Amino acid sequence: MTDKKNLRTPIVCVMGHVDHGKTTLLDKIRGTAIVSGEAGAITQHIGATEVPIDVIIDKLGDPRLRDRFMVPGLLFIDTPGHHAFTTLRSRGGALADLAIVVVDINEGFKPQTYESLQILKRFKTPFVVVANKIDRIGGWVSQKDMPFAATFKKQSSDVQARLETKLYEVIGELYNQGFAAERYDRVTNFQKTLGVVPVSAFTGEGIPDVLMVLLGLAQKFLEANLQYSAKGPGVGTVLEVKEEKGLGATLDIILYDGTLKKGDTVVIGSLGEPIRTKVRALLKPRELSEIRYESKFQQVSKVTAAAGVKISAPGLEGALAGSPIRVATEDNLEEIASQVKSEIDEVRIDTGSVGIMIKADTLGSLEALVHEFQKDEVPIRKAEVGDISHRDAVEASTVEDPLYSVIIGFNVKVHPDARDFLQESSVKVFTSDVIYRLVEDYQKYVKEQQEKAEKKIFETIIRPGKFKILPGCVFRQSKPAVVGVRVLGGVVRTNTDVMLENGNVVGKIKGLQSEGENIPSAKVGKEVAMAIEGATVGRQIKEEDVLYVNVPERHAKVLEHEIYESLSTDEKETLDIFLTLKRKDNPFWAK
């Protein structure tokens, strides 16, 4: 059996849609009530909380379980949505060992639920789904802090049936997303089937079951990942860079391997050369308190993985959230600095060629954004961490193509001087703290631009048209000939040449009238009076003749090769016939 001392605390990320109960769930686990102090009960800051194994066993209510679990506890990360999951990275991989995806059992899947699942699938992270808010199912009688099986037994058969229906809607949606899933107590193999735990984060029902499943997953599938060397040099990831009164710039980090001591030399990733500095103070949260509550810190001389810790040291201003932090010695300082720099360079994109610009607040979110846009085959010219600067704005303004004269900003600010410049420029800026929204907004913008470009083309291009001279509707024979016509396909416009089916151009449409009013064009199905200059009825044209708009070759190329899919069905049919007529004598016409 693995020695308990060699297993570090598993890092757990809580993900899910806004207002589905992530923070309430964590509060229940911690036994604190941080939610009440947060605006709108939505998590606002990054935090990390260590829940020791003894506290978990106490929640489970069975002291005999103490010897079954080797891990020293669970380290919970809590942030808005899945921001921390992408921030906490390690060489392009996810740092979190486990994840909880919280779903409101009554509302079902929402956009950020899907995004959470995509991220977890991409990083192959084991997770459990928490079907929250069971206390809001009609007729549910809450049993405070009770395990799910016990509270479920106390419900009426109608309520049990309602829960099962809602639960299997969640399970069905997980199947649609490519995950085999089942209620956790019916799962025989957690490696093949995802466990879904029904809970109420508000009443505490089902919370012991969530902890049990997490410990089980850690024990069964992560034992090798959790082994670490307590005596080795500390390795971690920067969670947040924070200005603290009396301390200046500090780093909130998650240490996931080795030990970090006061006085250690550390190397931290930044936009330029890596930062090399000495740890002045280590501030570790007490057990069951959150990193974001500064008054609860205690100074410590060293920390061992896994732990959330605040570092005070000189020169931390340029540190990047999501970047590596590593302990170095005099002997390997240059080597460690080189490794840290190469890791940062792997993420940054600066090709200088065609594409959009992406700015993000952390390396992890930058990676996630780049991944999503590349998945959609959107070219990226530049991607880096940091706020949108005046330089970025000027650079983007030099791009002529409106599809790429774009800056995407995730969780970043726009500098005031950049904002002034952007107001006067044609650069399009999209900012949000939700990745999928940025992708959607850009897709919508691209569609609008393409439609605008097509509209412009449509306005200048001569489109296909087909019409028939109606019998008994010759109003004037020549100079110009005025006849009644029915539009059989496409559109006819004034000032366009017309031809017969044999290819002979017979004249130009000089005017169109409908019910005595002059009109610029007429679409399929319309019957109008048409003035044709250059044609004489009885010579070049006669009643019952079918004529076509003589589309110039250059325009025909654009219609066939660039905007064909945007044409209406009758326009496509008319164009196809027109091209066939034109290519009888010249097969390469408009090719």
Curated annotation (Swiss-Prot):
Keyword Nucleotidyltransferase belongs to the record: no
PROSITE patterns, per the entry: G_TR_2 (PS51722), IF2 (PS01176)
A Pfam family per the record: IF-2
UniProt family annotation: Belongs to the TRAFAC class translation factor GTPase superfamily. Classic translation factor GTPase family. IF-2 subfamily.
Listed Gene3D superfamilies: P-loop containing nucleotide triphosphate hydrolases, Translation factors, Translation initiation factor IF- 2, domain 3
Gene responsible for this protein: infB
Region (G2): 41-45
Region: G3, residue numbers: 78-81
Protein name: Probable translation initiation factor IF-2
Molecular function, one GO term: GTP binding
Residues annotated for GTP binding in this entry: 16-23, 78-82, 132-135
Domain tr-type G: 7-223
Chain spans, region G4: 132-135
This protein's UniProt keywords: GTP-binding, Initiation factor, Nucleotide-binding, Protein biosynthesis
One Gene Ontology cellular component: cytoplasm
Region of interest (G5), ranges: 200-202
Function: Function in general translation initiation by promoting the binding of the formylmethionine-tRNA to ribosomes. Seems to function along with eIF-2.
Region (G1) location: 16-23
InterPro entries in the cross-refs: EFTU-type, P-loop_NTPase, Small_GTP-bd, T_Tr_GTP-bd_dom, TF_aIF-2_arc, TIF_IF2, TIF_IF2_dom3, TIF_IF2_dom3_sf
